[in-house]
């Protein structure tokens, strides 16, 4: 369930470039998060928000890497959205750990908040 957020405390997004990488898998949940992220960036004054969709959470780090390495259009921040549901095995934990580790390493290496 989405709740309202007070965007008054956010730094201004004016003149900044924001990117959202979102998975298509579990769209029932991810699409709501995507809509809320775009609304929040717009409320903070971001002129545009670039959105890139990928099949699932596993592909998010590859897309984020491509986004931050594009010549001449390095974003100020990248938001990554995906949902991994826990099943009967440890598969979800392995996917989640791998994706978050890859995103952290990318963020540090490229000096871009992800």
Mark where each language-model region is.
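Anion-binding alpha/beta catalytic cores of soluble intermediary-metabolism enzymes, centered on
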Residues: 1-22, 29, 66-69, 107-114
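Glycine-rich phosphate/diphosphate-binding loop of Rossmann-like nucleotide-binding domains
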Residues: 9-55
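Short, active-site-adjacent cap segments at secondary-structure transitions
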Residues: 28, 59-60, 85-86
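Active-site rim loops that border cofactor/substrate pockets in soluble metabolic enzymes
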Residues: 44-73
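Short glycine-rich anion-binding loops that position phosphate/pyrophosphate groups of nucleotides
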Residues: 82-90
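C-terminal binding/interaction regions
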Residues: 92-114
């Amino acid at each position: 369930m989405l709740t309202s957020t007070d965007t008054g405390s956010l730094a201004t997004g004016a003149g900044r470039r924001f990117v959202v990488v979102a998975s298509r898998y579990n769209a029932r949940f991810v699409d709501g998060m995507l809509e809320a992220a775009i609304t929040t960036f717009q409320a903070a004054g971001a002129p545009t928000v670039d959105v890139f969709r990928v099949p699932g959470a596993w592909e998010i780090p590859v897309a984020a890497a491509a986004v931050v390495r594009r010549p001449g259009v390095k974003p100020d921040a990248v938001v990554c959205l995906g949902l991994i549901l826990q099943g009967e095995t440890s598969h979800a934990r392995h996917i989640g750990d791998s994706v978050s580790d890859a995103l952290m390493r990318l963020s540090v290496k490229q000096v871009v908040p992800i």
